[in-house]
């Protein structure tokens, strides 16, 4: 015959289960560690019906500039992310740097990137400026974060 346990025993069991993870104290560099690579993430809300236009224009501006920086070794990687299910925000831009030091601005690096962009795309400068100025009409910057991945230590 099955007997019914009092409600307080179920509540106690639930609290015990919920409390167990709280008793384990995690410690950085013992249980987990942040990676040295830093990711800059920009979150963008593109106006409805403009996503295709925005991505096409982004390819001609931001993606080109990031490709130059990657070719020159200033960034590890970059990416454009979208969501089919999100209404807003709906675009995420990421730039991966080797470490925090690689994110520091430098006049030499700035000049080198601009010279390479000019060499590759200088004849399109007016069109690219017009595209960049038009971004504000179709998108809103929602957030900007510097994040890093966590590695768990066995």
Identify the meaning behind each predicted range:
Residues 50-76:
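Short amphipathic alpha-helical segments
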Residues 47, 51, 55, 59, ...:
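Solvent-exposed, acidic/flexible segments
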Residues 75-96:
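Acidic helix-start/capping segments at beta-turn-to-alpha-helix junctions
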Residues 2-12:
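Bacterial N-terminal signal peptides that target proteins for export
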Residues 10-21:
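Bacterial N-terminal signal peptides
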Residues 22-26:
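Sec/Tat signal peptide C-region and signal peptidase I cleavage site
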Residues 29-33, 68-76, 96-148, 152:
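An amphipathic, aromatic/His-enriched active-site/gating alpha helix that lines ligand/cofactor pockets
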Residues 27-53:
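Immediate post-signal-peptide N-terminus of mature secreted/exported proteins
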């Amino acid at each position: 015959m099955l007997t019914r346990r009092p409600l307080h025993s179920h509540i106690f069991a639930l609290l015990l289960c919920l409390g167990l993870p709280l008793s384990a104290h995690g410690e950085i560099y013992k249980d987990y560690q942040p990676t040295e690579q830093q990711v800059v993430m920009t979150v963008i809300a593109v106006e409805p019906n403009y996503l295709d236009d925005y991505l096409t224009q982004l390819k001609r501006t931001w993606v080109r500039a990031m490709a130059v920086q990657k070719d020159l070794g200033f960034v590890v990687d970059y990416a454009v992310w979208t969501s089919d299910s999100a209404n807003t925000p709906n675009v995420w831009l990421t730039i991966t740097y080797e470490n925090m030091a690689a994110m520091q601005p430098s006049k030499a690096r700035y000049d080198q990137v601009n010279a390479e962009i000019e060499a590759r795309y200088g004849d399109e400068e007016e069109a690219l400026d017009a595209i960049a100025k038009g971004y504000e009409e179709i998108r809103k910057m929602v957030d900007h974060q510097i994040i890093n991945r966590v590695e768990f230590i066995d």
